[in-house]
Amino acid sequence: YLHLPSIPKEKKLPVVLSREEIWKMLQSAELLKHRVLIGLIYGCGLRCMEVRNIELKHLDFDRKQLHIVQSKGKKDRYVPLSDHLIRGIKRYISAEHPTTFLFTGHTKDAKGFDSRYSQRGVQWAVQSISKKAGILKDVHTHTLRHSYATHLLEDGVNILQVQKLMGHERVETTMEYLHVCQLEQQKVHSPLDTVFALCSR
């Protein structure tokens, strides 16, 4: 029978927030828990499941890094923690006294341990705070992760290093962020500007 080639699916570019929009979200989060949550998702490029799975033992303040255990693809990785984030996490721990998971829900599990913050709870926090910040883009947890990768590339971090920090198996996945990066050498300009710059002296 006649075999027809499959029609390639349209690939949508990731939604990315500006640094100013990230700042607005941090400023709009009233609860310390939510500020730290957003700071970790964006500041470490975490998936929703990864931020929910953070345990106190995964935080290494001396080495300024977070151990992400068994993330997607079953590969552990380490990501750096900023000094600002470390201060916020310490304040949060001091105020909330979590025992196992960094972010907990309102119920205990069968063994009496703190239950993890629910996926719905994380997404609700991110979406409601983005709206409060006046951001018109459709913001989800992965939007903050996309923004992390894009901003690192714009800051000149090597793409292979970004791949490692994101936990991507294939560098091609990381390269998708190049389509939304505003790299200095890639900014489009009119050739007329070059003519004036060279010839109007």
Where are these regions (language model features)?
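Conserved catalytic core of the tyrosine transesterase superfamily
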Residues: 1-201
